[in-house]
Amino acid sequence: MYDIDEIYYDAIDLLKAMVAVPSFSREEKAVADVVEQAMTKFGLCPKRYANNVWCQSQDFCPDKPTILLNAHIDTVKVAEGWQHSPFAATEEDDAIYGLGTNDDGASVVSLMAAFRALTTMPQPYNLVFLASAEEEVSGKNGGEAGLPMLPPIHFALVGEPTNMQPAIAEKG
């Protein structure tokens, strides 16, 4: 079983750590290091290609379908008009402000939390969690570059801020 409070506070701490590290597209090494270290701390077995970091359920079985949980770790450059420091992870009124908290750090930590909780018990499917790079620029070393290293994926859930409106999309 798992401790939901522990997973919750770990997610908050990880989000703050991610915000504190500039992670502009094609410059994600430091934040990929943060995510990889967190995975290791949480008892996961991270793998890495460039700045893409992933792990899979420890009871992975090739006979079961595989679900991918994916969110990106890169951000756009800092624009003008910030009311809080973009790298300070400021907590105010039950919210955390900082560059990348919404797009897409909250998805990264939420999907990693779901992965951690779901992999503590037997499932009829495999899980893979991927924190991908270069999404903001559709870069050649982003998630697409890491996909060939993953097991065959049958279904993917991609975290991206859509104002709570489900979206279906593909490129190509």
Give the positions of each predicted feature.
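Short, contiguous, pocket-lining structural segments
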Residues: 31, 103, 170
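A generic structural signal for short coil/turn motifs at secondary-structure boundaries
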Residues: 26, 99-100, 166-167
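Fold-independent oxyanion-binding glycine-rich loops
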Residues: 49-51, 71-73, 101, 132-134, ...
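N-terminal helical capping/dimerization or prosegment-like subdomains
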Residues: 1-70, 75-78
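A generic local structural motif
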Residues: 5, 41-42, 53-56, 84, ...
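Active-site metal-coordination/substrate-binding segment of hydrolases
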Residues: 64-128
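Fold-level recognition of mixed alpha/beta catalytic cores in primary-metabolism enzymes, strongest
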Residues: 106-113, 119-172
